[in-house]
């Protein structure tokens, strides 16, 4: 079965979990690994992140969209350029995305974004029990995460859909332009734009820049690549 859940407050269980935080955690994870980072370690708190500082490690993330004091990078994927992060381990803490990862009980967890949409779909074709976990925003529904979930469901072309997956697929089918839909109607996108992150929204709504599938292994996202 394929299903979609939004901003779970309690643990969720499945065989293959796909964590989605379009704006911006999973987009940043995909970008960082695609640009040469050796791994991304998601953590819940700022304090936990700072404790992991050592040579070869970058402390990164945001609270309320802004880079915390003492951090090397924020949560803008545009900051994660090859010359800054290649060969480095990223410790990432964010308001939404890294929090929801802690609630997933799954045999495997992968990170999805529009940036690696086709690679994620290809990876999932061989999987049976799939749960698309939308991070949401501060525990609430996020339009952009649900829209990406719908895009994944649509491309998988499966019949064994839960109600959440059917709703996400129908929403995706109703949208003519995903980027414009997000920019015009997503409250989180509007807030990021008001804070000066319009380029982030543009970047995070770009499809298939990367052929990579970040997979969580022993608490670290590492890269899976497809030809």
UniProtKB/Swiss-Prot annotation:
Family: Belongs to the ComB family.
Coiled coil: none
Keyword line: Hydrolase, Magnesium
Gene behind this protein: comB
Entry's transmembrane regions: none
Enzyme Commission no: 3.1.3.71
Enzymatic class: hydrolase
HAMAP family listed in its UniProt record: ComB
Protein name: Probable 2-phosphosulfolactate phosphatase
Molecular function per GO: 2-phosphosulfolactate phosphatase activity; magnesium ion binding; sulfopyruvate decarboxylase activity
Cofactor: Mg(2+)
Catalyzed reaction equations: (2R)-O-phospho-3-sulfolactate + H2O = (2R)-3-sulfolactate + phosphate
Any single Pfam family the record assigns to this protein: 2-ph_phosp
